[in-house]
Amino acid sequence: MKSLTLKAPAKVNYLLDVIRRRPDGYHDLRMVMQRVNLCDEIAIALTDSPELSVCCGKDGVPDGPGNIAWKAARAMLDLAAGGQGATISIVKNIPVAAGLGGGSSDAATVLMGMNQLLELGLTDQELMRIGVKLGADVPFFIFKKTALAEGIGEQLRAMPPMPALWVLLVNPGVHVSTAWVYKNLRLTSRGELAKLPQFFSTVEDVCSMLSNDLESVTIPAFPVIADIKRAMLAKGALGAMMSGSGPTVFGLFRDREGAEAARAELVEGSGWFAAVAETL
């Protein structure tokens, strides 16, 4: 039977504004989302039998129906209605529950891979409509462009071209629940949203919009997030911020050498996860 292996990239948020709480319990957001080439690896193989299995072997990531990638594959197999199944194995290189979108990226990659293997011929827009039912960030990874995301994250517009950047990602390993962060976020009436630059020709242009409303919740509870931001800036990052609901912090650098040097100094003896990646 047919098979393929795909890469599922992580993301960082250059901007995360929380606009309002919605009646359905979600929040309206304004985000600028950027993919980076720290990737999970996903192998998908179709089978003649109808069983579906997803294997990851990573602590904190369920196998089977509890995995968002399983749900994505199930949705596509149900659409195909051909009696086939699939085996999916995931090598997790993206930290789990880290603000980097790893689970959403895995689901999006499975949707795109199954679309290809099953020869369903769905457009990206059709895949995105399936993806948003799985998770608010899933459509972004199908969109495959640096995006301004609004609504709960499903309304996507391509951003102007941005310079390629090197990104240092550091995760201190503290557990931050996304639900807890949003529950404890104090929404104040805000004025008009800051206008985004029309052009992004330099690293400084990107750094000028770095902002994350969720830091107001996470940093008081986990001061190490602020410590990492300060350390990154001290070691040459042109900007540093928490990604998503954390706890991963990213720093932006002009070149790989600067990012690698900062990584070596920052995490020596800490036991923290750290990786240098490039924007996609």
UniProtKB/Swiss-Prot annotation:
Its EC number is 2.7.1.148. The keyword Kinase applies. One of its GO terms (molecular function) is ATP binding. ATP binds at P95, V96, A97, A98, G99, L100, G101, G102, G103, S104, S105. Pfam families: GHMP_kinases_C (PF08544), GHMP_kinases_N (PF00288). Keywords: ATP-binding, Isoprene biosynthesis, Kinase, Nucleotide-binding, Transferase. One of its GO terms (biological process) is terpenoid biosynthetic process. The active site is at K11, D137. It catalyses: 4-CDP-2-C-methyl-D-erythritol + ATP = 4-CDP-2-C-methyl-D-erythritol 2-phosphate + ADP + H(+). InterPro entries: GHMP_kinase_C_dom, GHMP_kinase_C_sf, GHMP_kinase_N_dom, IspE, Ribosomal_Su5_D2-typ_SF, Ribsml_uS5_D2-typ_fold_subgr. Disulfide bonds: none annotated. Pathway: Isoprenoid biosynthesis; isopentenyl diphosphate biosynthesis via DXP pathway; isopentenyl diphosphate from 1-deoxy-D-xylulose 5-phosphate: step 3/6. The keyword Calcium does not apply. NCBIfam families: ispE, PRK14608.1. Belongs to the GHMP kinase family. IspE subfamily. Catalyzes the phosphorylation of the position 2 hydroxy group of 4-diphosphocytidyl-2C-methyl-D-erythritol. HAMAP family: IspE. This is 4-diphosphocytidyl-2-C-methyl-D-erythritol kinase. The lineage of its organism: Bacteria, Pseudomonadati, Thermodesulfobacteriota, Desulfuromonadia, Desulfuromonadales.
